[in-house]
Design a protein with these regions (language model features):
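Beta-barrel outer-membrane channel/assembly domains of diderm bacteria
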Residues: 2-4, 8-122, 127-128, 156-165, ...
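Transmembrane beta-strands of outer-membrane beta-barrel pores
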Residues: 36-42, 86-92, 131-135, 169-175, ...
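Surface-exposed loop and membrane-interface regions of Gram-negative outer-membrane beta-barrel proteins
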Residues: 39-121, 133-146, 178, 196-203, ...
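Detector for outer-membrane/organellar transmembrane beta-barrel domains
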Residues: 213, 218-406, 411
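Outer-membrane beta-barrel transmembrane domain signature
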Residues: 117, 180-201, 363, 377-406, ...
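Extracellular structured ligand-interaction cores
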Residues: 27-29, 63-65, 81-83, 108-110, ...
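Transmembrane beta-barrel outer-membrane domains
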Residues: 25, 57-63, 103-110, 144-150, ...
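Aromatic- and glycine-enriched pocket-lining scaffold segments that form the walls
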Residues: 144-262
Length: 480
């Protein structure tokens, strides 16, 4: 029997398939995001710090995304497309900044396949699989408070009654360190000089899997009003290598549940969103300004809970004057504080309040003034231990606070529209905090430590922490 050439067969099959798509011109698209600029001091403010005090006049460094995508096939009313996104971040103002330099990062953020129109009963529904963004955020503070981004698959916008249903399964492989568990014998877990977890063969084993099962249903309630109900189940799964170690561990970490109710309201003056989130389980310990998608491997958060409230939007009071706002409150408790237990934690509860107000006033067709004021307070109640009695001696509170005031002269294509991009901001910013708050030293949180070499050994003298500063600069932002 004559052998079939697989390549020839594939080419022949493609040729026969071409007539179904012969009249279709693919739709290619190019998009992206950019923020960059220069300022008088290098504060190295990361995303978490912006979440505390807002974006305006407080975004050093460069960040960008390039989006490339195209429709690759169409059969009847079904369209197949691919989309990709590459992200770049640079923390320092260097001319030649490579991947080998600290603070420079390139990441493949999205790469997924989408099919629209496959279901005869609902041509607007989508089927997707691959790596993609799956998150909600507050623009003014850049807080990605609901972030499940990763590899996955799902269906979106399925018509159900008056609303739309979306289902998704996403998975992350994240580092997991079990060294906190003293019941794991040293013969099973060892560390190298950098403290990384090694197996008995000297290989690093530090990954575990978290599966996210997400369901959301959005439906209209009245003119301009939309309600979304959402539930996410977070299920951790250890890889096979980890079972060897964890068979000798006293405690395990469990999954988590997240429930959300979000209400969007559009009206003649603008738009507003209010969302309430309840978390229960091992994702609670991400802290007040995290995203709720991180699973605490220590086991101390298995029974913890967190309530969070978000309210943000934009209101145009007149043709020239408007206000963008962001309000956030959160409270968590229920941590395991068992003495002589390897999953003991000293945290009892934490609570936070954050408010950002950004009024803006249009000067001309392409210019406006923006003034952003922000405030946050974050209090953590912790147990402190009586070593002599091996028990908790009581509780103490630690409070972090910060304030920011930024004034910016902004140029954009349409200064009457808050969302108009691209824009260039000429800004001056005043930052203030307390001793437990954010660090405003020019070169980051380690800058206020002075290292002095003595004859015997290096000595570290801790200087005065910078709790207030003034910066000025020019910042640009664009999306397309």
């Amino acid at each position: 029997m004559k052998k079939v050439n697989l390549l020839a067969a594939a080419v022949l099959a493609a040729a026969f398939a071409m007539p179904a798509q012969a009249d279709y011109t693919p739709n290619a698209y190019f998009g992206g995001f950019l923020r960059t600029g220069v300022q008088s001091k290098s504060l190295f403010a990361d995303d978490a710090e912006k979440a505390h005090l807002g974006r305006l006049g407080y975004e050093p460094g460069t960040y960008g995304e390039i989006v490339l995508g195209t429709d690759i096939a169409k059969v009847d009313e079904t369209v197949w497309s691919v989309s990709s996104r590459v992200g770049y971040r640079a923390d320092k103002n260097w001319d030649w900044y490579t991947q080998n330099d600290s603070g420079s990062h390139i990441a493949f953020r999205e790469y997924f396949l989408n099919v629209k129109g496959f279901f005869d009963f609902d041509k607007d529904a989508n089927i997707w699989t691959g790596k993609r963004f799956y998150r909600d955020d507050t623009y003014v503070n850049d807080l990605r408070y609901y972030d499940l981004s990763g590899l996955g698959a799902g269906v979106e916008n399925i018509s159900l009654g008056e609303g739309k249903l979306s289902l998704a399964w996403l998975r992350r492989d994240e580092s997991r360190d079990y060294l906190w568990d003293s019941t794991v014998d040293a013969s099973y877990v060892a560390t190298d000089t950098d403290g990384k977890r090694l197996d008995k063969d000297g290989k690093v084993k530090s990954f575990g899997t978290v599966n996210f099962l997400d369901v959301k249903y959005a439906f209209p309630v009245w003119d301009g009003g939309n309600l979304q109900l959402r539930h996410t189940s977070m299920i951790p799964h250890r890889n096979s290598d980890s079972y060897f170690e964890y068979a000798h561990a006293e405690h395990d970490y469990k999954g988590a549940q997240r429930y959300s109710v979000a209400f969007n309201q559009g009206f003649s003056l603008g738009w507003n969103k209010t969302e309430i989130i309840y978390d229960h389980g091992s994702n609670v310990n991400w802290g007040a300004f995290g995203n709720g998608g991180w699973i605490d491997p220590s086991g101390c958060s298995n029974k913890a809970y967190r309530w969070s409230l978000f309210n943000f939007g934009v209101v145009n009071f007149t043709e020239r004057f408007g206000l963008a706002h962001n309000l956030y409150m959160t409270y968590s408790s229920g941590y395991d504080n068992t003495i002589n237990s390897t999953n003991a934690t000293d945290k009892k509860s934490d609570k936070a309040f954050q408010l950002t107000l950004r009024p803006f006033y249009q000067l001309t067709k392409m210019t406006k003034l923006e003034l952003e004021g922000a405030f946050y307070t974050h209090t953590t109640k912790s147990y402190f231990k009586n070593d002599a009695n091996d028990a908790w001696a009581g509780t103490k509170n630690s409070n972090a606070q910060g304030q920011k005031l930024s004034l910016a002269y902004v140029i954009s294509p349409d200064a009457s529209n808050f969302w108009s991009k691209p824009e260039i901001q000429f800004f001056v910013t005043y930052l203030h905090g307390n001793e437990n708050g954010l660090e405003f030293s020019e070169y980051g949180s380690s800058a206020y430590q002075i290292h002095v070499d003595s004859a015997s050994a290096p000595v570290i003298h801790e200087g005065t922490k910078t709790t207030n500063t003034v910066i000025f600069g020019v910042h640009g932002e664009a999306w397309w």
